[in-house]
Regions:
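Extracellular loop-to-transmembrane helix junctions
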Residues: 11, 34-129, 133, 240-249, ...
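C-terminal membrane-solvent junction of multi-pass transporters and transport-like membrane proteins
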Residues: 154, 322-331, 370-423, 452-456
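Helix-loop-helix connectors at the membrane interface of multi-pass transporters/channels
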Residues: 1-7, 80-83, 109-130, 162, ...
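Helix-loop-helix junctions that connect adjacent transmembrane segments
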Residues: 5-10, 48, 121-125, 157-285, ...
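Membrane-interface "cap" regions at the ends of multi-pass membrane proteins
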Residues: 1-36, 41-46, 58-63, 72-75, ...
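Membrane-interface loop-to-helix entry segments
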Residues: 114, 127-183, 213-214, 237-241, ...
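TM-loop-TM module centered on a large, flexible mid-protein loop between adjacent transmembrane helices
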Residues: 80-82, 87, 119, 205, ...
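Membrane-helix boundary/coupling elements in multi-pass transport proteins
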Residues: 74, 97-112, 213-226, 281-321, ...
Length: 456
């Protein structure tokens, strides 16, 4: 299917409030609401420290991306920076890897949607729910970017209000005594200690924790459609650290005080489970609505992100020119449709392997995310060196350059080692060389066909 040709320019339809809430929405997603369950089982209350460490690394990456985006706000975000400052293969590989990453994230979140629906209707297979919301969200994204922005704005508002309310309500239950005798801050250290399985238990969970932060860099993708990226991008980036502290560290500290961590199960959102265990059915149902909203929010962002990344690849000559078609509303219809067709594989995966689908997709996401973040840090090093040679002082410099970049790269290497030692996740690491080889073949085919373009 091909959209009517109306040019190849995206409209700058995202306001500052959209950018801020898109950044916030990226920080509150399935990783926190569902992925944290398995981490709690292995790391206990130490999960709080794990999220703080991974959050700091995510913030460093965000500042590196933010510095580049403020200087050059373009569609395709960092793949263009890799292309321009590192080389054509780096741009080709990072762009396609990012697209595949968000296709996988989209699949994982659609799977999570199915799990949340089963809280109310256990008899409905996950693939049915995934298929229904797949159609709805893609239809919405085919309207215009303002509709996406408004939808994500309100999704994020719901998530923020809910998490803050949960922290306040949970704190009240904790300190008023209304949470029952098991609700006490001593749960953070009395059930086998803060790190019941030692640092090993925490370290082995860092890969899954990292999954939670896989939406933060979406801010960089919004730059091409932001009214004033020079102001909105730095503001959104700097606020990430506070959001991580409040929404991850704060919410988990309250939750793990309300109920011993040993009562958490891996296949249910700990947020919903804890209030359900406390006998508060109303709050449990309300929170399930929130975690469902969170998954839909991230999937909504994925649809947006995938289409814009493909658009950026097409602009660079790294994807078919037909993907540059933009309709009269400024929507890249072809890229949305192509991304949707690939994401539809999620429905098939959930049909064939409903029990293991989420775990498999999460492992694949983390591997792609490691490549993604590593390439952001490496591209940023090249970017900064180029600017220094040009005598240019950037407006939004990254923190701790270049030490921060190397710390991030060391962290990524550590995550890969952890995944190799984790049953069920090692396969995704073994697939990395295969994936790079596929990218290499694709690049050679593109070069042979003479479709190279000059970076601009």
């Amino acid at each position: 299917m091909e959209a009517q040709q109306h040019g190849d320019q995206l409209k700058r339809g995202l306001k500052n409030r959209h950018i801020q809430l898109i950044a916030l929405g990226g920080a509150i997603g399935t990783g926190l609401f569902l992925g944290s369950a398995s981490v709690i089982q292995s790391a206990g209350p130490g999960i709080i420290l794990g999220y703080a460490i991974a959050g700091f690394i995510a913030f460093l990456i965000m500042r590196q991306l933010g510095e580049m985006v403020v200087e050059e706000p373009v569609a395709g975000s960092f793949s263009l920076f890799a292309y321009k400052y590192w080389g054509s293969f780096a741009g080709f590989a990072s762009g396609w890897n990012y697209w595949v990453l968000y296709v996988l994230v989209a699949m994982a979140d659609l799977t999570a949607v199915g799990k949340y629906i089963q809280f109310w209707y256990p008899e409905i297979p996950t693939w049915v729910s995934a298929a229904a919301f797949f159609v709805i969200i893609n239809a919405i994204n085919l309207t215009n970017v303002k509709v996406f922005g408004e939808m994500e704005f309100w999704f994020a508002i719901i998530k923020v209000i809910a998490v803050v309310a949960m922290i306040i309500f949970g704190g009240w239950l904790l300190f008023s005594g209304n949470g029952g005798p098991q609700a006490t801050v001593r749960n953070l250290w009395e059930q086998g200690g803060f790190l019941p399985h030692g640092m090993t238990g925490l370290v082995m969970m860092m890969a899954i924790i990292m999954f939670s932060f896989g939406g933060l860099e979406l801010v960089g993708i919004t730059a091409a459609e932001a009214d004033n990226p020079e102001q909105s991008i730095p503001k959104a980036t700097n606020q990430v650290i506070y959001r991580i502290l409040i929404f991850y560290v704060g919410s988990l500290a309250v939750l793990l005080s309300l109920l011993p961590w040993t009562r958490v199960t891996a296949d249910t959102s700990p947020f919903v489970l804890i209030f359900h265990e406390l006998g508060d059915t109303f709050v449990a149902n309300a929170l399930n609505i929130v975690v469902l909203t969170a998954a839909l929010s991230v999937y909504n962002s994925c649809v947006y992100c995938n289409s814009r990344m493909l658009f950026g690849l097409a602009q660079q000559g790294n994807a078919p020119k037909a993907l540059l078609n933009v309709d009269k509303r400024g929507v890249p219809v072809n890229t949305i449709i192509v991304s949707a067709i690939v994401t539809a594989l999620c429905v098939l995966i959930n049909y064939m392997a409903p029990e293991s689908a989420f775990g498999l997709l999460m492992a694949l996401v983390v591997s792609a995310l490691v490549i993604n973040w590593a390439m952001i840090s490496l591209a940023h090093i090249k970017f900064r060196r180029a600017k220094q040679q040009q005598g240019v002082t950037t407006r939004f410099p990254a923190l701790l350059y270049p030490l921060g970049n190397w710390v991030c790269l060391l962290f990524m290497a550590g995550v890969l080692v952890i995944m190799l030692l984790t049953p069920g996740m090692a396969i995704s690491v073994y697939l990395i060389p295969v994936w790079i080889a596929i990218l290499g073949v694709g690049y050679l085919v593109k070069q042979k066909n003479g479709k190279t373009v000059k970076a601009h």
